[in-house]
């Protein structure tokens, strides 16, 4: 009876933004939140890094450090981690590397890189706190918060499932972990068709496969 309706086309982020703007109050998010642009994120992280009391990575320029930290922050969100769970995973990885990598130069390089990533978590925590203080979200926040909303609010899940009776996912090979978590929470036993080609995957760094 709904065949005369036009299909709704959304990116994952625009879909997540809609969920957060319409239902964010359920988890304490102001519906009038502002989005932090890439330039704004870069400026904010630059301020944090410049004020950081220790040298975060002596092998990189300050601009390079900022870029690496923002990239790691995005990876953490896209994989569905928090800073704390990321810290636990990196610490465990580091302990395992220490056991197997003694005397191995290649392993030492990986150990050093892992230590730098652990050091980056402090600025990421500061960045997240500054965003909360400013009342802004970045693109990764949209997906994390939307997933939390649909997980914690059954009425929101029911309303969205009723609105989207059938779901078509394009370029499915580029779906990240957090995007998949959002989709499976909402539409895990729903009418879903996914189209993708694993040979064209370009977002493996964020968990897509």
Model-derived regions: residue spans:
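Generic structural signal for secondary-structure transition and capping sites
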Residues: 24, 54, 78-81, 155, ...
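Coupling/switch/interface segments within P-loop NTPase motor domains and analogous charged loops
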Residues: 41-131
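Conserved P-loop NTPase-based nucleic-acid remodeling module centered on helicase motor cores
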Residues: 1-72
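Short, polar/charged, Gly/Pro-enriched helix-capping and turn/loop motifs at alpha-helix termini
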Residues: 30, 55-59, 83, 134-137, ...
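Conserved helicase NTPase motor core
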Residues: 8, 33-41, 45, 73, ...
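Short acidic (Asp/Glu) and glycine-rich catalytic loops that position anionic groups and cofactors
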Residues: 24-25, 103, 193-197
């Amino acid at each position: 009876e709904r065949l005369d309706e036009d299909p709704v086309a959304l990116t994952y982020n625009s879909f997540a933004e809609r969920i957060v703007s319409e239902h964010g109050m359920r988890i304490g998010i102001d519906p009038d939140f502002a989005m932090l642009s890439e330039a704004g994120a870069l400026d904010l992280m630059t301020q944090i890094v410049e004020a950081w009391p220790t040298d975060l990575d002596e092998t990189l320029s300050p601009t390079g450090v900022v870029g690496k930290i923002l990239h790691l922050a995005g990876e953490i969100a896209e994989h569905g981690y928090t800073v704390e769970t990321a810290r636990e995973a990196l610490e465990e990885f580091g302990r395992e590397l220490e056991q197997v990598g003694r005397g191995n130069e290649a392993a030492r390089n990986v150990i050093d890189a892992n230590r730098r990533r652990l050091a980056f978590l402090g600025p990421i925590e500061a960045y997240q706190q500054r965003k909360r203080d400013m009342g802004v979200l970045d693109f990764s926040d949209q997906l994390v918060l939307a997933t939390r909303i649909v997980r914690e609010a059954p009425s929101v899940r029911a309303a969205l499932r009723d609105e989207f009776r059938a779901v078509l996912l394009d370029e499915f090979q580029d779906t990240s972990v957090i995007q998949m978590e959002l989709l499976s929470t909402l539409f895990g036993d729903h009418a879903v068709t996914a189209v993708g080609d694993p040979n064209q995957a370009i977002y493996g760094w964020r968990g897509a496969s």
